Amino acid sequence: MTSYAKLSLFSPAKINLFLHITGKRADGYHNLQTVFRLLDWGDTLEFLVTQDSFDPTAPINEQHLLVRLSSTVAITAQVMDNLVIKAAVALLQAWQNSALTRSSDPAVTPHLPVIEVTLNKVLPTGAGLGGGSSNAATTLIALNKLWGFHYDIEALIKIGATVGADVPIFVLGQDAIAEGIGERLTPIKLPQHQYLLLNPAAHAATQALFAHPDLQRNVPALSIDEIKAAQSCYLQQLNAPFSNVFEPVVTKLVPEVNQALNYLRQLEALTGTQARMTGTGSSVFLPIPTDKISLITHHLSNAGAPCDYVLTQSLDKNGQNPE
């Protein structure tokens, strides 16, 4: 067991500075290349050890209560589909599948406490900001401590990849180049930046986007060294060979995203930077130089924006890495 009784952890958003599909895999998934950037804007999760307990060796099913989840927004109708619950189940399954861990770890007791989880939701869903994946990663990190499993970050990343393709970056907790389906991560040092994010209240289904005939699926893969050396092409600008291959498809299918992106493009003359979409949408963002923040703030206060927006900055710390 552990001495932790309660944890409160930040669950950040991410943006994709670019997003390429480099080919289709034998398993039906697509290989991607992207640079993930974590933001100082996100949800908060509170984890409380309760007096209730469960047998961690028992089979896991819907009646196997590992955590009690409450949220400031509506939770998935089928609770087992919630990524917080999926993360808890994946962590326990990994422990159950490791006889070595069970036999050699004196910190693990015959019974583990049920954890009460409160999700204070800020991030919009279906926005390409990774909110659900971030919540799942934060849950893995918290329960790893509270249940005394002592998995290292590499192990948690592997477990996270079974929950969702974007979960590993949030377990890593820092900006990174991602390859594969998002699970192969190479940390990258990027300068601090501010961003204006617009969050339209509409989005296209990810499955439909991957199936769309106009989606570019064969962008030539770049080496890690090439991506690191070309930061000036995707940090404040988005120049060839970098792009978000989903952006032209989403802007055709979702007028609200196109409207938000056009709004940001009108500000490019003020900022000298380039707007783009994150992930598969629907959020779009514009890098804002420090000396332009007051100008953009003044513009927003006078002219407003076509949808919800937030001014934020890149996360300047290592995030949620486990101890």
Curated annotation (Swiss-Prot):
Q: List the disulfide bonds.
A: none
Pfam families in the cross-refs:
GHMP_kinases_C, GHMP_kinases_N
Which protein family is named in the record? Belongs to the GHMP kinase family. IspE subfamily.
* Record keywords, A-Z: ATP-binding, Isoprene biosynthesis, Kinase, Nucleotide-binding, Transferase
Q: Could you tell me which pathway this protein works in?
A: Isoprenoid biosynthesis; isopentenyl diphosphate biosynthesis via DXP pathway; isopentenyl diphosphate from 1-deoxy-D-xylulose 5-phosphate: step 3/6
The UniProt function text for this chain reads: Catalyzes the phosphorylation of the position 2 hydroxy group of 4-diphosphocytidyl-2C-methyl-D-erythritol.
- NCBIfam families, per this entry? ispE
Any idea which positions bind ATP?
P124, T125, G126, A127, G128, L129, G130, G131, G132, S133, S134
Reactions catalysed, semicolon-separated, are: 4-CDP-2-C-methyl-D-erythritol + ATP = 4-CDP-2-C-methyl-D-erythritol 2-phosphate + ADP + H(+)
Gene behind the chain: ispE
- The record places the active site at K14, D166
The answer on whether this UniProt entry bears the keyword Ribosomal protein reads: no
Per its UniProt record, what Gene3D superfamilies does this chain match? 3.30.230.10, GHMP kinase, C-terminal domain
One GO molecular-function annotation for this sequence? 4-(cytidine 5'-diphospho)-2-C-methyl-D-erythritol kinase activity
Put simply, this protein is called 4-diphosphocytidyl-2-C-methyl-D-erythritol kinase
User: One of this protein's GO BP terms?
Assistant: isopentenyl diphosphate biosynthetic process, methylerythritol 4-phosphate pathway
- The species is Psychrobacter sp. (strain PRwf-1)
